């Protein structure tokens, strides 16, 4: 299974690199990155869309039609529309989320930005995101971009990852620690 995951990462990296270089050559990095962020949000919000791109049962042509129609309707840049068509035609739609992530990471590295992956029990408000961004900018000394997601299993609190550092202040982790401490006493 790990070799499959490594393959997905390799595919995602190669496609993201090609997209990045094309967007850079055409001076469209900002528009392409904005479109990819929009696509990421769509994927995060729509289970149906995630199933369409991940399903091996749905044919290449149907995936291509779905992705290009979505890109057209969303008003994505020509580079993104063509890219999604090629990805679907090559039957690599399953790797689109990884491609988006790899592209955005490459762009952030070029701009000297760091991405903080924040998983919280509930969706963060704009004020919370702003406060976290300010605190993380100060703590890291870099410009921090927040990639927020929700995992209700955390029960409360959040997990923040910046590079190789992680701070877990989730309620589920605190309860697990308490449970372990109580077992040690008894």
Curated annotation (Swiss-Prot):
Its main location: membrane. It is found in: Cell inner membrane. Gene3D superfamilies: N-terminal domain of the delta subunit of the F1F0-ATP synthase. It is a peripheral membrane protein. GO terms for molecular function: proton-transporting ATP synthase activity, rotational mechanism. Keywords: ATP synthesis, Cell inner membrane, Cell membrane, CF(1), Hydrogen ion transport, Ion transport, Membrane, Transport. It comes from the Bacteria. It holds the Pfam family OSCP. InterPro entries: ATP_synth_OSCP/delta_N_sf, ATPase_OSCP/d_CS, ATPase_OSCP/dsu. The keyword Cell membrane applies. The keyword Ion transport applies. GO terms for cellular component: plasma membrane; proton-transporting ATP synthase complex. Belongs to the ATPase delta chain family. F-type ATPases have 2 components, F(1) - the catalytic core - and F(0) - the membrane proton channel. F(1) has five subunits: alpha(3), beta(3), gamma(1), delta(1), epsilon(1). CF(0) has four main subunits: a(1), b(1), b'(1) and c(10-14). The alpha and beta chains form an alternating ring which encloses part of the gamma chain. F(1) is attached to F(0) by a central stalk formed by the gamma and epsilon chains, while a peripheral stalk is formed by the delta, b and b' chains. NCBIfam families: ATP_synt_delta, PRK05758.3-2. F(1)F(0) ATP synthase produces ATP from ADP in the presence of a proton or sodium gradient. F-type ATPases consist of two structural domains, F(1) containing the extramembraneous catalytic core and F(0) containing the membrane proton channel, linked together by a central stalk and a peripheral stalk. During catalysis, ATP synthesis in the catalytic domain of F(1) is coupled via a rotary mechanism of the central stalk subunits to proton translocation. This is ATP synthase subunit delta.
